[in-house]
Structures are given as structure tokens and as C-alpha cells.
Amino acid sequence: MVREEVPVSTRTLQWKCVESRADSKRLYYGRFVLSPLMKGQADTIGIAMRRALLGELEGTCITRAKSDKVPHEYSTVVGIEESVHEILMNLKKMVFRSDLYGTLDASICVRGPRHVTAQDIISPPSVEIVDTTQHIAVLTEPVDLCIELKIERGRGYCTRTQNNYQDGSYPIDAVSMPVRNANHSIHSYGNGNEKQEILFLEIWTNGSLTPKEALYEASRNLIDLFIPFLHAEEQDINRNMEDNLKRASVPFFAFDDGLDNIKREIILKRIFIDQLELPPRTYNCLKRSNIHTLLDLLSKSQEDLMRIEHFRVEDVKQIFDILQKGFTIDLLKNSNQFESR
């Protein structure tokens, strides 16, 4: 049997944004193109990217509201046009922009008559309200509306259990989905075995991320998922990798003197700081300084790290301790100076 040779494109794979617009504060649109791709590749990438965009990205939302003197969720309050349930549904729609993890406190405390909007939410400086005009309630009489809020960062849709009713606290189902919709389409060109494809990717976001930022985050999350397969060939380098994997932590490698620098750099680029299990505050400081991978981190001196806003000596020491436990690279030759400060 004679097999036909299947040609492989020698052109560099490129992507670009061909359209970008903001229809409103809570609706951004972006259209991207990736080409040239071999037959079948566009669908593979398109399906994976769409699922990652809709299910893997994190968002910030209100997860709990508390107000005194409210008998139950479906009750009404004199002087307030909406029922308690309607107010909770309006709070559920609030869109925030934040990189911080953990539970944050916010509040609303106003007096009517007036129109209550997202602008009336008193939130931490680290939390930005995307659309301050979002409607919450209408106070028709001179009554007070005071609500304590819990804001959290999460992923996907999470149904909250109904508890703590006695203290006037009500859970709000978390919708932590910054991407409202994502579609992909494919354009084929060429003939026979030379047929190639162009992937078109459309992304709509809620304003907490731009479509380009969403595309970057989704790509990074997909890379994180495939990293364990890429590391399979490195098992001989570090015999302790199996133990690391059993602990569900990032696979670490011992770089000996014979390891080629190019190979070392490629591996470091594949490991993102998300996998180092850093404390939330340290992680957020690094991200704000555009330190995304282990290669980015190792290229910084301790003086560079200390110049990061809100970074402390203890944070640098903790980073070095985490890396030293997983790598045989000697990162702490001068660790005594941390203790002497």
C-alpha cells in the first residue's frame, strides 16, 4: 500500500484580535483568529477553549447578605419597593473586579427616600465595582436599609445551603462566571491533503475581564491541566516526583549541572506560580507585578522582590523556603540575612 505524504505547514501559527468593543459596562465583546491550522486542529482547540472560558475562569461575587429585623426571604419591608428576595436577586447580579482570594466584607447603609444602586456598596479598596449604576432597591419612605455583605472569589456556579436564617443572614447562589458566552467557528481553505483551517473565536464577558484577558486566563488554565503529561519524560531526573504527585502538589525537578539551560528554561516556563501553593496575599502581590511563571520568579533577585508593593521580608523568605523544599537549586545561600533583619 502506498501512503500519500501529508504536508505540514511551515508557516508560524499566529493569532490576533480582529474585533473588540464594549457594548456596555457589563458586556464586552472580542473576536480572535488563529491560523494556519491543519485539518481537525481548529475544532480541537475551539472546543477546549470554549469549555475553559465558560467553566475554568474565576470571578468575584456576593455570596451572603445579612440584615436585621427580616423575618424571612420572601418578606417585604415597609418603605422598600422590592421584597427581600428581589433585593437578593439584584445583589446576585452585581459584577466585581478583584484578584484577592478569601472572604471579604462589604456593606450597604443608606436612608430613603432614594434609589439604591451598586455605588452605595461600601467595599474594600481591592474590590472594584464594574457598573456602579446596577439597581438594588428603591426606598419610597425615610427608612434605613443596612445590609452586611460577604464577597468571595470562585469558579462556576455554586448553590449555597440555606442556613443561618435565625440571624437574618441569607446565602446567595454564587455565579462566578466572567465569560457570558463563547463560540467558535472554522473556515477551511485549500484542496486535498493541503487543506488548512482558520479558527475564529468569539468571547463575551461581563466586564470584570476583557475578552483578551479571558483568552489568556483560559489558555493558562488549559496549560496547567496538561503539565503533568509534559513532565512524564522528566521522571528520571527526580526520583521523588511520585511522592510529590501523591500529595497533589506541583511536580518539582532537581536541575543538576548537566541539565541543558534551554531545557531548564522550557520546564520553568511550564510551571505557573498558581501551582506553588503560595499564600493568597503573596500570590496576589506577584501577579500584580507580572510574575506568572517559575521562570519569572527565579529571574528576580531578592532586592527585586522586596521592591514589590506590600511585600515583606517574611514573604520573600517563605517563597524561598517553598522553592527549596521542591527544588535542589540552592536559592538560600544567603538566607541568614533574612533572619538578621
Swiss-Prot record:
Example of a GO biological process term: DNA-templated transcription
Subcellular location per the Swiss-Prot or TrEMBL entry: Plastid, Chloroplast
Residues covered by region (Alpha N-terminal domain (alpha-NTD)): 1-233
Cystine pairings recorded for this chain: none
Chief location of this protein within or outside the cell: plastid
EC code(s) of this entry: 2.7.7.6
Membrane-spanning parts: none
InterPro entries: DNA-dir_RNA_pol_insert (IPR011262), DNA-dir_RNA_pol_RpoA/D/Rpb3 (IPR011263), DNA-dir_RpoA (IPR011773), RBP11-like (IPR036603), RNAP_asu_C (IPR011260), RNApol_insert_sf (IPR036643)
A GO cellular component entry from the record: DNA-directed RNA polymerase complex
Alphabetized CDD domains for the sequence: RNAP_alpha_NTD (cd06928)
SUPFAM superfamilies, A to Z: C-terminal domain of RNA polymerase alpha subunit (SSF47789), Insert subdomain of RNA polymerase alpha subunit (SSF56553), RBP11-like subunits of RNA polymerase (SSF55257)
Free-text domain note: The N-terminal domain is essential for RNAP assembly and basal transcription, whereas the C-terminal domain is involved in interaction with transcriptional regulators and with upstream promoter elements.
Family: Belongs to the RNA polymerase alpha chain family.
Free-text function comment from the UniProt entry: DNA-dependent RNA polymerase catalyzes the transcription of DNA into RNA using the four ribonucleoside triphosphates as substrates.
Protein's recorded name: DNA-directed RNA polymerase subunit alpha
Native organism: Nymphaea alba
Gene name of the encoded protein: rpoA
